[in-house]
Amino acid sequence: MILIAFLLSYGFGNESLLSQLYPGRVVMPKPVYDEIDRPALAWMKARVDSMINAGKLTVVELTSGTDEFDLYYKLTVNPDEGHKIIGDGEASSIALAKVKNGIVASNNFNDIFTYINEYSLEYTTTADILVDAYKKGIIDENQGNTVWANMLRKRRKLGAVNFSDYLSTHS
């Protein structure tokens, strides 16, 4: 199971790289879905809704009384001493990943790195997904550079000036 926090991988055409790389394994916690339901993110919500309607993404509710809800509550309202409260999207992704043995997909490690380590969670980033797509022949290096440049224009932090540079050190 791949869990999306604030990471929605760019695709080519109408296909998402996530759904191509991880068919049937892409889920979005309901709190994340709720966070993208605003005018400034209408483009992202439209893409998510398209993936949902095509059966390529499932939105998962956190139900009161479940282990994942209890952890979500702890992370958003009453964290352990020395830990900070994190946002609903990050917390729901971490809670589901911990309970369901999923992978957290996020570029926002400032808030969640402590929890990723503490719970020994597997995680991935946009950069990792692009490398995986490249290795599997879903995208070529030029397409990776295009996605990378688009994300940098949106002020995303990716760890290299372009995909080619990242690829040279991570493949």
Q: Residues of each region from the PLM?
A:
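Positions that flank functional sites
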Residues: N110-F113, V131
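Active-site-proximal, substrate-binding regions of enzyme catalytic domains
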Residues: M1-L96, K100-G102, F113, N142-N150, ...
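Short, electropositive alpha-helical surface patch
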Residues: I116-Y123, A160-N162
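Long, charge-dense
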Residues: T126-I139
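Short hydrophobic/aromatic-enriched beta-strand-loop microsegments
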Residues: V26, L121-I129
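Glycine-centered loop/turn motif at secondary-structure junctions
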Residues: N101, Y119-S120, G137
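Short Asp/Glu-rich motifs
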Residues: R38, Y115-N117, K135
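Short beta-strand scaffold positions
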Residues: S106-N107
